[in-house]
Every structure is written in C-alpha cells, then in structure tokens.
Amino acid sequence: MMKEVMIWAGAGQIGMAIARRMGYGMKIVVGDKKIENAQAIAETMKAAGFDVLPMEMDLSSRESIRHFINEAQKYGKIKMLVNAAGVSPSQAPIETILKVDLYGTAVLLEEVGKVIAPGGVGVTISSQSGHRMKQLTPEEDALLACTPTEELLQLPMLQPENIKDTLHAY
C-alpha cells in the first residue's frame, strides 16, 4: 500500500522529535551516513508504532541523495522533508563542514524540490552558531542564495584561506 512519505536526513534526536510529531501514519525513510545510526533510531521509532525504513545516505554526495530519494519514492509520494543532518566544528575539517552542511543541504533541497508532492513541506535544522559570527553582507547573502549548487563551494568567500576555523565554517 502506498503511503505519504517523510524523508528524514540525519538520524539524531532533533530529527526524531520532529518525525515523531509529524510522521504518524506516514512511511518514514531515515538516512544517515552511518547506517547503524539510522537502524538504531528506526528501531526506536518502530517500537513506538512508526513505519520506518533506515538507509545509508551521505549528504555530501548528490548521487547518494538521489538514491535516497528514489528509494523513498517506491513507498509513495514524498510529502515531507526533515533535514537534521550535518557535522559540527568538533567533528570535521572546514572542507567537510562546507561539503555537508552547505552543499549537501542545497543539493537535498534542490533534489527534493523536483519531486515533492503538491502541498509538501520541509524543514532544515541549522545551528545557532550563525549568531556568534559577524553578519553576512547583502552581497554575500545574495551569492549564497543565487549561486548554482554545483558552484557554491568555488565561491571565494568559502575557500579555506578565507575561513578562520571550523567554527566559522559551521
């Protein structure tokens, strides 16, 4: 039986709280770079009565994201996206943080946007660290908003020599 589908990236507690609140009656497909994380959280959700499929999904890879979405579509129309995936400054170098948190989020939104059902919704959870840094200029905001996804990581402002440390990349 086809159901409405929620896709959920990043098998953590914040994503689970959203999925528990919003995903009852839906097929929930949870993806995480570490399949064991997706499997563990899927078991917790299943024990609470949710229909959950765990998958390995690497947010830094367009191919992996497309595979995740294609698999989810086998269960029905994607009606909801929960993006709670990401890496923190203590977990990875600057390049990885940008590849996952910026590029990966842009790819996920772009690819889901192509297939989400009419009336579908999505939420992306981000960090409060943005409030610790200086505000971006209007020009920087425009570059991040309007640069094609595949060109984002080539922006001069995102080159490692222009990013002070991992906290600033975050």
What is the predicted role of each segment?
Residues 45-63:
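Rossmann-fold cofactor-recognition segment
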Residues 7-9, 77-86, 120-127:
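Rossmann-fold scaffold of SDR-type NAD(P)-dependent oxidoreductases
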